[in-house]
Amino acid sequence: MTQFWPAPAASGAVRATVPVPGSKSITNRALVLAALAEGPSTLRGPLRSRDTELMATALRALGADLQDGPEGSWQVAPGPLRGPAEVDCGLAGTVMRFLPPVAALAEGRITFDGDPRARERPLDAVLNALRALGADISGDSLPFELQGTGKLAGGAVTIDASASSQFVSGLLLSAPRFEQGVTVTHTGEPVPSLPHIDMTVSMLRAAGVEVDDSKRDVWHVAPGPIRALDLDVEPDLSNATPFLAAAAVTGGTVTVPGWPERTDQAGDAIRDILARMGATVELGPDGLTVTGPAELAPLDIDLHDVGELTPTVAALAAFASGRSRLRGVAHLRGHETDRLAALQRELSGLGGDVEQTDDGLLIEPRPLTGGNWHSYADHRMATAGAILGLLVPGVLVEDIATTRKTIPDFPGMWSSMLGAVD
């Protein structure tokens, strides 16, 4: 039976400090590197959510030893990679795209499957690349099977990563363990979400791996050891954006502690986005503080590199003082759901005026009314519905539990934030 969550309306300007759990992107990259490292690693402040638990469970199945440490940390000791093993990807793009290269280093049969929607998501780029590098794989999408020999030759490979930067990151993360390393060349439309590849490169270098990304659309990773990690995981900045948006739309003030001064996280772009919409944005020792304006300004913005922020920005644009254009996000049609079609459908269902373009959305603010907001098993669609519900009474968000994909207790955090209003 479908469950609908009554999105709470704000009774005034939100004023709150909202600690946000660790970054999913950093946590899942760190787990892969730790499983392939030359010694035991410690991850402090990792995200504990469905996506990261799926990654941890899969790495255990492949041979890594992951134990709970003090204060929510993870202790990871690498072990011989071997099958037979079964990997449940759920709906986690990082699991379905980062772990096939790891499994190619294992000895034995590894099978991959996931949620029904995951079977529709593109995987052929990474699977064909692995075949070209010497892997034995049956299938081009979930479910598929990989027969490993305990090693992979590696070498040079050309892929089309225009559907997802995760195709590149997945190959790079395991490449130090390939006999020849890897040289990945992208051909096709521009790679989306480049900050995620920058994050992968930074984390590899921090682990002592030699990476050359000096040439556009070409990445070379040399073979060699991966140093053990001793890592404090940053807060998840993309997951922080709905809470900062709450300040923006209610004219309130929200602080997210621990916001890094420098980061490769795509979510850091929310600072510029909110400032362009008229909010006051301050980064200081207490974290990032956003104070909403009297009126939100519309914006024309290319979100190609930060497409994951599109649902949050679309919700903000629905309350702006004029028409907004969100560009550069055609690749969102292949995410957890077709996010462009979903945003148009759901905003229109509440009375909005939304038009799809070739690569984005045109949003003309209109008076909105309550109604059902379908999440399509997409965590960012669900949080966008919560933002709208702050100012639109009667918004009912379908399956708010889907937010557990990346936030362990979004409803509780949202309610706590709304407990502090003027």
UniProtKB/Swiss-Prot annotation:
Known catalytic reactions: 3-phosphoshikimate + phosphoenolpyruvate = 5-O-(1-carboxyvinyl)-3-phosphoshikimate + phosphate
InterPro entries associated with the record: Enolpyruvate_Tfrase_dom, Enolpyruvate_Tfrase_sf, EPSP_synthase, EPSP_synthase_CS, RNA3'P_cycl/enolpyr_Trfase_a/b
Active site (catalytic residues): E308 (proton acceptor)
Enzyme class: transferase
Keywords from the UniProt entry: Amino-acid biosynthesis, Aromatic amino acid biosynthesis, Cytoplasm, Transferase
CDD domains: EPSP_synthase
Binding locations of phosphoenolpyruvate: K24, G93, R121, Q166, R339, R380, K405
GO biological process: amino acid biosynthetic process; aromatic amino acid family biosynthetic process; chorismate biosynthetic process
GO MF annotation list: 3-phosphoshikimate 1-carboxyvinyltransferase activity
Main localization of the protein described in the UniProt heading: cytoplasm
Pathway: Metabolic intermediate biosynthesis; chorismate biosynthesis; chorismate from D-erythrose 4-phosphate and phosphoenolpyruvate: step 6/7
Subunit structure: Monomer.
UniProt-listed NCBIfam families: aroA
Function: Catalyzes the transfer of the enolpyruvyl moiety of phosphoenolpyruvate (PEP) to the 5-hydroxyl of shikimate-3-phosphate (S3P) to produce enolpyruvyl shikimate-3-phosphate and inorganic phosphate.
UniProt similarity note: Belongs to the EPSP synthase family.
Protein name as it appears in the record: 3-phosphoshikimate 1-carboxyvinyltransferase
Species for this entry: Saccharopolyspora erythraea (strain ATCC 11635 / DSM 40517 / JCM 4748 / NBRC 13426 / NCIMB 8594 / NRRL 2338)
Lineage of the organism: Bacteria, Bacillati, Actinomycetota, Actinomycetes, Pseudonocardiales
Gene of this entry: aroA
